[in-house]
Amino acid sequence: MDPTRPPFRGSPFHTPLGVRPPVLETKEEGPHGRAVLLPRGRALLGASAPSSDTTQRDPSDSRNVLPALFRGMGIETKPSGIPGRGGPVFGRGFLSTMSSGDGPDQPLSEPSIRPSLSTRVQQASDFSTERVALGRARFPIPPVSMEKPHVPTGRGLLFPSVLPTLTSDPVPKESPIATLQIEKEEKWEPLPKKGSKGSPCQLGLNLIKINFQNEAVYQYHVTFTPIVECRSMRFGMMKDHRSVTGPVTAFDGSILYLPVKLAQTVELESERRTDGQKIKITIQMTKILDPSSDLCLPFYNVVMRRVFKILDLKLVGRNFYDPASSTVLQQYRLQVWPGYAANIRKTDGGLFLLVDITHKIIRSDSVLDIMNILYQQSPENFQDEVTKQLVGSIVITRYNNRTYRIDDIEWNMSPKDSFSMSDGSKISFIDYYSKNYGITVKELDQPLLLHRPSERKAPKGKALDIVLLLPELAFMTGIPEKMRKDFRAMKDLTQQIHLSPKQHHISLGKLLKRIESSADAKNELQRWGLFLDTDIHMTTGRILPIEKINLRNNSFPAGEDLNWNREVTREACRSSVHLLYWAMIYPKRASAQAQELSSMLERIGGPIGIRVNHPNCVELRDDRVETYARSIKSLLEGEGKVQLLVCLISGTRDDLYGAIKKLCCVQNPVPSQVINTRTISQPQKLRSIAQKILLQINCKLGGELWGVDIPLKSVMVIGMDVYHDPSRGMRSVLGFVASINSCLTAWYSRVVFQLPNQEIMDSLKLCLVAALQKFFEVNHSLPEKIVVYRDGVSDGQLNTVENYEIPQLQTCFQTFDNYNPRMVVIVVQKRVSTNLYSTATGQFLTPQPGTVIDHTVTNRKWIDFFLMSHHVRQGCGIPTHYICVMNTANLGPDHLQRLTFKLCHMYWNWPGTIRVPAPCKYAHKLAFLSGQFLHHEPSIKLCDKLFFL
């Protein structure tokens, strides 16, 4: 740092109006919910609960009760009512205490500055009508009005009520527990999802079977008379009666879970310490649960979090890491922390602990080190460069292992500035870190990093605070941009991250041994009657039959590695379009490369059945965006017919690429090919690269490269995906691609722009009706069956797809007279934690492409399967999860699995299989191009071509 010019100091600092006091920090040990009750008059967004600890809960309260708790209570009350204060607590969060029975401790937070104007509105709760905060939550509270509710669109779809209807009468002093009846869960019947095609294979899964010692878990409803509104006071009263309930409890304020059976009704008495009032506590058994019940999963996951903490694993975000076992890449100044992403799931095979191996990349340089480097490189534009480099980055503070996003830099503040503690006393940042963490701050003139927490992380009853961090104590995470372009560096890093199946199994085995060798960890599990298997779960899967690839004059099996690059570059394509009238634009310094590429395309076109004429060459004086744009407009407006426009550009330039694509896809529609001169700069590789370019050009002109046998007749296959660009705040883009011929080799595409961050699509009718009309033009009939592959949907949105998107699709059929096709809708999930290991040879290897498993690990509520369709060269085999949410075509499991596998062969940008069906990949490419570069719907003239490849 330049001693004569402190680069970090700005204008004098003025003490902020509000300060959030630092308090001791603990992690909330329960799932976080979103569906909550709000009193009348309170805004649905940004409203704050009363500051007192009452039964009415704030949307930001992470300790809200799961709606599933009351769903299983069997409470029968009057219809259409409202709870008063102190009534049963509703919500989605769960269990702030476990076996300890203590209330939540105060968290130790970062020094933070509260905004001067509160973004929340506090209003006292009353007994009037409650409204519902709708969002991603799957179980919104039912409306209280008897009128038909308005159904909003988007993620917050209002589903039928799953909670007991509540009374609008004043709440009685005593809860009507006499109406509670003990009931047992209904038995579950497995869905018909197992296929039979293919050869069996032995598989290992990254699942550990959970076994039970207890026969049941007992659910109780706890009533306090008179009503005790303070939640922590209720925790304290229940803690006083551990001699009755036992040391192991899960209590959320009104619902109590125990591994032991009490009498049907237990009455206890406590004294309220604030006024000496005698409080009657009535514990009423409401349900006998199987130990593997869904209602038990939240506190089982809390138990596992405690086990990981006992093993001295550090919680960072949602995963646990082991910094003590980190690998240091000294030459790149990086640390790689190994860790585990674990959660308990109930599947068709029972209750399992799913453990995925994960890694956290931590840079050895602090944010302050990066600031010093930037200052040395550009002292004049120092602050601008720092803002450009750091804002939006994720940092970790090692003293508490928490991650933060940098939203801004406070140049006018330093560690010497002070803030107010909860008791009103002032303390500087220097003293705060020294007192609480024993850290001595060395750089006193450094600015502070600013982080704005999201609304859902706001403490109960408090406005959103601004977190301030010291650059000296914050470390960058992730891979540096410069390193991403270094092939050797990325190779060294991926060797540490992409573990082989054998290494995966060893890591999982080490975790199980650590749990087994820790008496405290085993005791934590046994308190709830849980114990784990000593190894991962083994089962049997299937390898689907190898598909046959069809070219124009030849057919051949795909082979074990599922790659047919040699065949498609030596034999004629299934259907080709001759390249007769095309143009090539390039800067003057790339003229030699342009001539070589043109000559090579003419030579290699013959074997693959494409005749290539000499192009109309346009040489540019420079490579500015304006020069390209002017030449392209002049060429396309002056020429009578141009089949294709090829542009050579130097380097990776998003601005130039976007300008070319806008001109060719929106303003003057023509298929275009943009080629980086670096790609064709090596003569020894030019032939193979030119072959790939020509095959891609053939697709863009409407040609077909290869196909597979499709036994289904009169079928349309649709792929849908959504692209989001949150960094730019642009609208979301829906990519829609549908097949329009019988062999699924011709495609029709459309794009729909949506509101920001809107995943559920609102404009399907426009796309599907246009696709059906195009299908009719080609085939002179409408499809009898429609198969939809919907990408980018999480488990929590499955019901929304079923209840909202599918009805939109079905309304399209009313456009045509007497048309009611059979329909299949399959959700495609790529981001899964399930790993497959082949154990056929006695060793843990990557499964063969075509490996499918449709049992054990599958979802109990849906017909689904996991398919490993692609060839993996490095790391573990991560399958793709397919969930069938609708099937009126009566396609069996074998039909669904084999059709999906066939479509994974049909992506023409790669002569092999890919992770998802081709229409999904096409939809993704289309949505990405439109959202990232075009920012507009492509011209309708290009809809029947794969112009977006």
From Swiss-Prot:
Segments forming domain PAZ: 366-478
Necessary cofactors: Mg(2+)
Keyword set, alphabetical order: Biological rhythms, Cytoplasm, Developmental protein, Differentiation, Endonuclease, Hydrolase, Meiosis, Metal-binding, Methylation, Nuclease, Nucleus, RNA-binding, RNA-mediated gene silencing, Translation regulation
Gene3D superfamilies, per the entry: 3.40.50.2300, paz domain, Ribonuclease H-like superfamily/Ribonuclease H
Entry comment describing in which tissues the protein is expressed: Expressed in oocytes, testis and liver (at protein level).
Stretch list, region Disordered: 1-125
Described purpose of this protein according to its UniProt entry: Endoribonuclease that plays a central role during spermatogenesis by repressing transposable elements and preventing their mobilization, which is essential for the germline integrity. Plays an essential role in meiotic differentiation of spermatocytes, germ cell differentiation and in self-renewal of spermatogonial stem cells. Acts via the piRNA metabolic process, which mediates the repression of transposable elements during meiosis by forming complexes composed of piRNAs and Piwi proteins and govern the methylation and subsequent repression of transposons.
Protein name in the entry: Piwi-like protein 2
Taxonomic source organism: Xenopus tropicalis (Western clawed frog)
